[in-house]
Amino acid sequence: VMVGVSGGKDSVALTIGLAELRKYIGFDFTVQAVTLDPQFGGKPMDYTVLQELFARYGIPYEIRRTEIGPVVFDYRKEKNPCALCAKLRRGALHTAAQELGCNKVALGHHLDDAVETFYMNLWREGRIGCFSPVTYLSRRELTLIRPMLLATEQEVIGAVHAEGLPIVKSVCPADGVTVREQTKEFVRERCRTDHAFRQKTLHALQESGIDGWRPVHTGRGSFSITNEEE
């Protein structure tokens, strides 16, 4: 399982969580951490704290320097950079997984991410949609998994603080001023007046017919596995 590690709380928590899960799950698997350094401003980021953390847990870790930052902000000068950045990162992550011999790519999305994506698709594109918990990429022969989808952002933050996990602060020029950040604030406001807002949205996702979201009773988990080509 290759984990795409940005350095933020979600991907760091996911990496350590998967490494620790091997002790209890009943079958073994390998965890490989990979960071794609976008090199915003043409400068490499310092990921020393992550190198030290993953070394303590015995997790192989690779940093790949990319030109994603300069391409998005300097060459293309995107007014809405997130879509292009995400597309470039996806391609680079999938390539890294294949080159490293991994058949699964784990992403650190949590419940808040899913809720925000649901409303962003509704408002911006007028459609009911969200990423799937599990997605099979037939052309790449890779499976994307999102193991933390039922955890809230606050639960992830709590785990990071409890374990004292280090994070690398984002230096993206668009950080905090994106449409997602506006949607995140909407969700926060709704949750202040309706504490069940996230769970209600999760129920809507599960009843929406979106691939992979309808729960099934397996005895161990609630998500069905969907094969969806991307």
Residue spans for each PLM region:
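Short, surface-exposed, polar/charged, turn-prone segments marking secondary-structure boundaries
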Residues: 29-32, 59-63, 89-92, 132-136, ...
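The feature marks non-catalytic terminal segments
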Residues: 165-230
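AMP-forming adenylation/ATP pyrophosphatase catalytic core
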Residues: 1, 5-10, 29-34, 43, ...
